[in-house]
Amino acid sequence: MVLAAPLLLGFLLLALELRPRGEAAEGPAAAAAAAAAAAAAGVGGERSSRPAPSVAPEPDGCPVCVWRQHSRELRLESIKSQILSKLRLKEAPNISREVVKQLLPKAPPLQQILDLHDFQGDALQPEDFLEEDEYHATTETVISMAQETDPAVQTDGSPLCCHFHFSPKVMFTKVLKAQLWVYLRPVPRPATVYLQILRLKPLTGEGTAGGGGGGRRHIRIRSLKIELHSRSGHWQSIDFKQVLHSWFRQPQSNWGIEINAFDPSGTDLAVTSLGPGAEGLHPFMELRVLENTKRSRRNLGLDCDEHSSESRCCRYPLTVDFEAFGWDWIIAPKRYKANYCSGQCEYMFMQKYPHTHLVQQANPRGSAGPCCTPTKMSPINMLYFNDKQQIIYGKIPGMVVDRCGCS
């Protein structure tokens, strides 16, 4: 004990030397620790008969319930920021609920996506899932709405439809499937309809508006014969993968297309303009794409509830409601279970070196201790409008807390 006392005092002095600059030379915790060490060792080799002064307890901070509420609020703000960042959006798209109703196509592909995937946010994820990387969202399905054509391909203001815009990210993916969807108006009686799709090109040479001859403005790329028997309208899909490949290889060749569907009387049944009653019936392109992915494994952690008295690090339930955010641009899910971490993390083991342990004991607030944080997270599926009013279906990684731990 006599030999150990100077060594203990030496470690304590070293700990005080290692304190961060700018702190007071005599903090309450350091003074108490020094007094305790001096009392145990005996300053100058003499034992003290006086008892060591008691150490005043440090403030506990917020009550558990207040701390949890603070953790919830931070988690919600973090989720909003992460979604925009992972979708590569600088800000939330300015799309109101009324605009969503107008743009949302009333078509089979969209309903199939909603039916195929659970968008309630409470279904169990598979044990294994694929991710593009650890951060950015993975695109699986892209729905591009028809837009107005460039004036360079119009004559006397027509045709106004249809041009499809694709981002560079989509053009560098592998296209597994590409379909053009066109809505045909109902017919009073069974009829044969001749649908044709023409590729548009700018007028060249003398082939300008009002001129004669010159370059061809229309190039037929697809022609279909369709038998209509329904009186309630019909969604017709056309394989467009080959055309899309040529557009992606040569983006400058994408000037849009013109769609016609004539019945025997010469009436064009294809809906290509947003007139009264045509909301959600505009042509659109559906793409299934494949991005590079890698395998990751999901592992659940310990759960607590809001009424739990547990003070240690634990996972708590948290439901994110996008409608409460005013984010109408997210089609599905409208809400999902995100969860959050909260609780205390204690030093479970003594540090590797004695002087490190003494530093932590002498100045616990100046030491970087373990924090309660997510140690495992999983993705969510999302169907949303981007800033170009295109409908995107993809997977956003790291949005559900599966496990919490001290790290």
UniProtKB/Swiss-Prot annotation:
Disulphide linkage map: 304-314, 313-372, 341-404, 345-406
One function term, GO molecular function aspect: cytokine activity
Residue ranges the record assigns to the propeptide: 25-298
UniProt-listed SMART domains: TGFB (SM00204)
Compartments reported by the entry: Secreted
Location (main, coarse): secreted
Gene Ontology CC entries for this record: extracellular space; protein-containing complex
Post-translational modification as stated in the protein's UniProt record: Synthesized as large precursor molecule that undergoes proteolytic cleavage by furin-like proteases. This produces an inactive form consisting of the mature C-terminal portion non-covalently bound to its cleaved N-terminal propeptide. Activation of the mature form requires additional cleavage of the propeptide by a tolloid-like metalloproteinase.
Keywords assigned: Cleavage on pair of basic residues, Cytokine, Disease variant, Disulfide bond, Glycoprotein, Growth factor, Secreted, Signal
Keyword Signal: yes
InterPro entries, per database record: Cystine-knot_cytokine, TGF-b_C, TGF-b_propeptide, TGF-beta-rel, TGFb_CS
Consequence the record notes for mutating residue 298 to Q: In VHO; loss of proteolytic cleavage of N-terminal propeptide; markedly reduced function in the activation of SMAD protein signal transduction
CDD domains reported for this sequence: TGF_beta_GDF8 (cd19388)
GO biological process: activin receptor signaling pathway; amacrine cell differentiation; camera-type eye morphogenesis; cell population proliferation; mesoderm development; metanephros development; negative regulation of amacrine cell differentiation; negative regulation of cell population proliferation
Annotated positions for site Cleavage: 121-122, 298
Tissue: In the embryo, strong expression is seen in the palatal epithelia, including the medial edge epithelial and midline epithelial seam of the palatal shelves. Less pronounced expression is also seen throughout the palatal shelf and tongue mesenchyme.
Known glycosylation sites: 94
Annotated signal sequence range: 1-24
Family named by the database record: Belongs to the TGF-beta family.
Physiological role: Secreted signal that acts globally to regulate anterior/posterior axial patterning during development. May play critical roles in patterning both mesodermal and neural tissues. It is required for proper vertebral patterning and orofacial development. Signals through activin receptors type-2, ACVR2A and ACVR2B, and activin receptors type-1, ACVR1B, ACVR1C and TGFBR1 leading to the phosphorylation of SMAD2 and SMAD3.
Disease: Vertebral hypersegmentation and orofacial anomalies: An autosomal dominant disease characterized by supernumerary ribs, supernumerary cervical, thoracic and/or lumbar vertebrae, and orofacial anomalies such as cleft lip with or without cleft palate in most patients.
Subunit structure of this chain's protein: Homodimer; disulfide-linked. Interacts directly with ACVR2B. Interacts directly with ACVR2A. Interacts with ACVR1B, TGFBR1 and ACVR1C in an ACVR2B-dependent manner. Interacts with FST isoform 2/FS-288.
Record's protein name: Growth/differentiation factor 11
Species, as recorded: Homo sapiens (Human)
Gene: GDF11
